[in-house]
Amino acid sequence: GWMVPLAFIGGYISADFASGLFHFLADNYGSTSKKFFGPVFIRPFREHHVDPLAITRHDFLEVNGVNCAMSVPILLATYALLPVGANLWTLMFAAYIGLFLFGIFLTNQFHSWAHMPNPPRIIRALHRSGLILAPDHHQKHHTPPFNTYYCITSGWLNPILARTRVWERVYE
């Protein structure tokens, strides 16, 4: 029935939240000089605010490599360890994890496309559909005071998190 599609949606929404939480933390905490985390995770987010179009000048591997290196091994291990007999809970778990990790893997790509001046027609259609982060939606993050709309997978959670002032409350 309806529970497996609901798990897919839940996984994708969770990826959107994870992207927002990570983006919020990278923008506001830590140092770019910290070993490993600084240059790999924090610096790209901070530099992105200086040159938002830079992400569009990187190749697929540079944009998505770190997220791929984190999500694909987890996905493979998860599916390798799933029991063979697929009951409803197993299917729901697989659907949730699959869409969560798919969203994490492609978050930076969706973010890049939101900054691309002239994306391909199919990407524009995905933007209009709301399935991936849309440029006009993401622009709110690049508007002073730069303290909202951190979710960059689909952006679905941004209005809710802004209305409830979640990031402001965490920062206080």
Spans of features found by a protein language model:
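Cytosolic/stromal cytosol-facing helical appendages immediately following the last transmembrane segment
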Residues: Y29, S33-F37, V50-L61, G85-M92, ...
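Catalytic donor/gating beta->alpha subdomain of glycosyltransferases that bind UDP-sugars
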Residues: A26, K35-R46
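Helix-coil boundary and interhelical linker segments in multi-pass alpha-helical membrane proteins
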Residues: G1-A7, Y79-A95
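Transmembrane alpha-helices and immediately adjacent membrane-cytoplasm interface residues
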Residues: S14, A77-L81, G98
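Core segments of transmembrane alpha-helices
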Residues: L61-L81
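Alpha-helical hydrophobic/aromatic positions enriched in membrane-embedded helices and signal peptides
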Residues: F8, A15, F41, Y96, ...
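Alpha-helical transition-metal enzyme core signature, strongest for iron centers
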Residues: S14-A15, F41, F45-P52, H138
